[in-house]
Amino acid sequence: MSISPTALSIVHPVAVTPAMLVATNIAETDFPAWEVGTTYTLGQRVIVLSNSRVYESLQDSNVGRDPLTATTWWIEVGPTNRWRCFDRSVTSQTVAEGTDTTTISYTLRPGQAVTALAALNVTNATSMRVRLVDATHGTVYDRTVSFASQPLQSGWWNWFFGQRQQPTQQIMTDMPSAFGNADLLVDFVGGTGMGVGALVFGSQMRFGIGLQYGARVGIQDYSRKETSAFGDVILVRRAFAKRANFDLFISNNELDSLQNFLSSIRAVPCLWIGADRYESTILYGFYKNFDVLIAYPEHGECSLEIEGLT
């Protein structure tokens, strides 16, 4: 018996480059742009526009030293606000700021078919609109989803009076595959300081007949939890990563293609969509290992251990 009647979907994300970015309302104004003639002090931060990264000065009297090459004078902090939703971290967010603090918009030209998209670690948003616009056929996909809060428990009392929680992610897997040259437009609307942790999209591969019951999901917590010599507990809250163990029914005629595909994406972060009804079975990360059991003449079983990114 399977937990999901649909196949396991694996999305190998498109690596977003500056050449793909057609338009956005997120400016690169986190810090001043680095200038060769400016003197920087210890701890001062700058942006290198050529790679959209933030760097921090490691010394005083820092002048004329290129952050890209002078590694004893500069340390890389991370991407600019514009590019945080495209890095390999779910925790870091692109935040709506500047003159427009309630919308985040991107127009991208991936140069390939996009059949699935996920927005992860989204905070303070009310809606997300995704469109595919082809130069010849016009708008070929247009869908808007809501981030309206939902009751934590079922029942009429909880619907009207119980606690509610806002979704932090949205997944779209119904995008058409016939428009490889279409522009991808993504628009978020929300409250002040809205943030998007990861915007992941690409072509999806489907394998198997469904996930078996017995799937295990959880998190790996990287918080600091120590006890001092006097018995005091020291707690420092840090990032966490989702994790999951899936057992998948597969047809034996797709066994080789599954193994070859998984081998090709080793150590590559992908989007894993287990069962649509359980948000916990949707992860952005990599598989640690997998095993395929040829159990029956027509069907087999595949066990996957997946670790999400922080």
What are these regions (language model features)?
Residues 1-95:
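Tryptophan-rich substrate-binding surfaces of secreted polymer-degrading and adhesive proteins
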Residues 2-18, 79-99, 107-310:
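Extracellular/virion structural assembly segments
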